[in-house]
């Protein structure tokens, strides 16, 4: 019975997981940005293997949540889009990682 309370608590934590982060394409984007200081759009598209349109759509959602900062500019005469994980985005990834880690550890017990 006592173990049931522990399981219910863990399930509740999973039920409250950030769905914006949990979506596979956005999770890939966030993982790449977590490991680099800044990435350009082309690098991120290649790293995630998402189409430009799909990547752009997911980035818009992450930007609206203030998880990602999008900076548009030029490299010489060519347009360039630079992407950074915000402090809030980094915190969201950390929270997601910790929640998933705990849930997976509890499976082993």
Language-model segment annotations:
Residues 2-14, 31, 90-109:
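Amphipathic alpha-helical dimerization/coiled-coil segments
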């Amino acid at each position: 019975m006592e173990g049931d309370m522990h399981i219910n608590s863990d399930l509740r934590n999973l039920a409250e997981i950030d769905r914006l982060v949990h979506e596979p394409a956005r999770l890939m984007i966030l993982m790449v940005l977590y490991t680099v200081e800044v990435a350009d759009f082309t690098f991120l598209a290649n790293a995630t293997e998402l189409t430009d349109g799909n990547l752009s759509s997911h980035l818009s959602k992450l930007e609206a949540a203030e998880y990602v900062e999008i900076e548009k500019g030029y490299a010489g005469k060519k347009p360039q889009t630079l992407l950074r994980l915000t402090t809030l985005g980094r915190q969201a990834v950390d929270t997601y990682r910790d929640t998933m880690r705990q849930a997976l550890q509890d499976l082993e017990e």
